Amino acid sequence: MILSLSHFLIVAAMLFTIGVAGIILNRKNIIVVLMSVELILLSVNINLVSFSSFFGDLTGQVFSLFVLTVAAAEAAIGLAILVAYYRNRGSIAVEDINMMKG
């Protein structure tokens, strides 16, 4: 069985929907929100690579590597901020983060 472009787009659309649902349904835990954002970025990367492969151009695949690099840096910085915030406040609830000064 040969996988066509529509197969990849369906998988990417499902991952995107799961990521958006994770953000909408779970707004209390910031770690779940960060994981949902990463899932959305993964679905965008799947779209970039699948369209790039379908049209025979390497630009989308190279751009996907840059997006993965930025996503990894974003996740590392976000988790470092959360660890520092948890050490100061003792909670990582989204409601508590809104009360920060600065």
From Swiss-Prot:
Q: How does it sit in the membrane?
A: Multi-pass membrane protein
Q: How does it assemble?
A: NDH-1 is composed of 14 different subunits. Subunits NuoA, H, J, K, L, M, N constitute the membrane sector of the complex.
| Family of this protein | Belongs to the complex I subunit 4L family.
HAMAP family of this UniProt entry?
NDH1_NuoK
Q: According to its UniProt entry, what is the function of this protein?
A: NDH-1 shuttles electrons from NADH, via FMN and iron-sulfur (Fe-S) centers, to quinones in the respiratory chain. The immediate electron acceptor for the enzyme in this species is believed to be ubiquinone. Couples the redox reaction to proton translocation (for every two electrons transferred, four hydrogen ions are translocated across the cytoplasmic membrane), and thus conserves the redox energy in a proton gradient.
Task: Give the protein name, as stated in the record.
Answer: NADH-quinone oxidoreductase subunit K
The lineage, from the top, is: Bacteria, Pseudomonadati, Pseudomonadota, Alphaproteobacteria, Hyphomicrobiales
Q: Does the keyword Lyase apply?
A: no
* UniProt organism field: Methylocella silvestris (strain DSM 15510 / CIP 108128 / LMG 27833 / NCIMB 13906 / BL2)
**Predominant place of localization:** membrane
Sorted keywords for this record are: Cell inner membrane, Cell membrane, Membrane, NAD, Quinone, Translocase, Transmembrane, Transmembrane helix, Transport, Ubiquinone
What is catalyzed by this enzyme?
a quinone + NADH + 5 H(+)(in) = a quinol + NAD(+) + 4 H(+)(out)
Q: E.C. number, please?
A: 7.1.1.-
Q: Where do transmembrane segments lie in this chain? A: 5-25, 30-50, 62-82
Query: Can you say where in the cell this protein is located?
Result: Cell inner membrane
Q: Which GO terms describe its molecular function?
A: NADH:ubiquinone reductase (non-electrogenic) activity; quinone binding
Q: Which GO terms describe its cellular component?
A: NADH dehydrogenase complex; plasma membrane
Quick one: a GO biological-process term for this protein? ATP synthesis coupled electron transport
| Gene label | nuoK
